[in-house]
Amino acid sequence: MFLTGFDAPTLNTLWVDKNLSEHTLIQAFSRTNRCFGETKKFGNIFSFRDIRENFDQALKMYADKRGLKDIKSNMVMREFEEVFEKFKDWTEKIKQKYPNPDEILNLEKEEKWDFSDLFGEFLGDYRTVKSYHEFDKDNPYLPSDEFNKYFAAFSQIQEEIRKEKAEKKALEVQEEDLSNEVRKEPQIFSWEYGEGIQANLDYIFHLIKDLYNCDNEQDRQKVLDKIKTAIRTNPEIQVNEDILNEFIEDLGKSFEKEKLEEVWKTEGKLRECLKDFCKKKEESNKKKIINDFLVKGVFLVEWVADKQLNTAKKKGEYSPSWSDTEKLIWKEKSTNLPTMTEKDEDGNFKWRKLITDISEAFKNHFERFIRFVEIR
């Protein structure tokens, strides 16, 4: 039987065109319902046959009475009307407490955390309701433009929480509460909740095209606000917001309006323009990294860096081994290399920190100037 031994946790959807029953049905359905970390909480079954009766019968055969109730309530999707009512309740609660999404980032820290917790819980149900074909993303309760504004604020607050928690962990500092009240810790939600709701580069390119077709400053500002919101819905793109802003400005300077119209014909041409722009920035940033370490007395070999970055481009990620990073250093030309056993004031090995710093510098370089332009 094909299903025997077939196990792929990443499998998302199973299309069924057979009258499955009993253990075969359970075995088939379980293949796509395997959870996969934070990226996959459930699978989807699309059946071209009416096998509801077979499904109910199979559950009765292989689940105890208590488990059967849990399976039916948690495994089988509810009717759209029921799910959509819950979605409407969520939007009412969010809008009542936070009527203006543009003002959320101006709130006090704990108020922002409260919003982050509320919206993060809502995203789980949002992901569910948007999986139904009946769901209209431009519904009157929370249309996509408004949702993106809330999600942009949520994304930024989540990033602030991550940084604060990382700093506390690094410093091993426990924050004292002077009021003697126990303050609720903010939650960190998985970015995958935003899967399918984050803006991609093609959408941003579409907005950039609109930008240069604006006839007045007021319309131009509206499009710029849309671009800003779109960027902030996707953490991968948000970290490169400065590059995109420079790119938009550079386009206006580099092309006359007639030539711009040729560029606008396809988003593919815009992506090529961004690649060219990032290539120039990449070269200057790479030289800056090398120069920054040279100032510290560490000589890095440029052609080795190029080779490792090209390998990373083919793999889609920058993940050199420890020895690969060490190969970047030309020891004979370096004037201030620590020994393998030398430690700093905190007792950390200086050589280990140097290798980590070099690796992090080139990893950040790769993410910003090479991998970034491939984001879809």
Swiss-Prot record:
Gene3D superfamilies: 1.20.58.910, P-loop containing nucleotide triphosphate hydrolases (3.40.50.300). InterPro entries: HsdR_RecA-like_helicase_dom_2 (IPR055180), P-loop_NTPase (IPR027417), Type-I_R_enzyme_R_subunit (IPR051268), TypeI_RM_Rsu_C (IPR022625). GO terms for molecular function: type I site-specific deoxyribonuclease activity. Pfam families: EcoR124_C, T1R_D3-like. Coiled coil: none annotated. GO terms for biological process: DNA restriction-modification system. Keywords: Restriction system. The keyword Methyltransferase does not apply. The N-terminal section of a putative type I restriction enzyme that if reconstituted might recognize 5'-GAN(7)TAY-3' and cleave a random distance away. Subunit R is required for both nuclease and ATPase activities, but not for modification. PANTHER family: TYPE I RESTRICTION ENZYME ENDONUCLEASE SUBUNIT, TYPE I SITE-SPECIFIC DEOXYRIBONUCLEASE PROTEIN SUBUNIT M AND R. This is Putative type I restriction enzyme MpnIIP endonuclease subunit N-terminal part. It comes from Mycoplasma pneumoniae (strain ATCC 29342 / M129 / Subtype 1). The lineage of its organism: Bacteria, Bacillati, Mycoplasmatota, Mycoplasmoidales, Mycoplasmoidaceae.
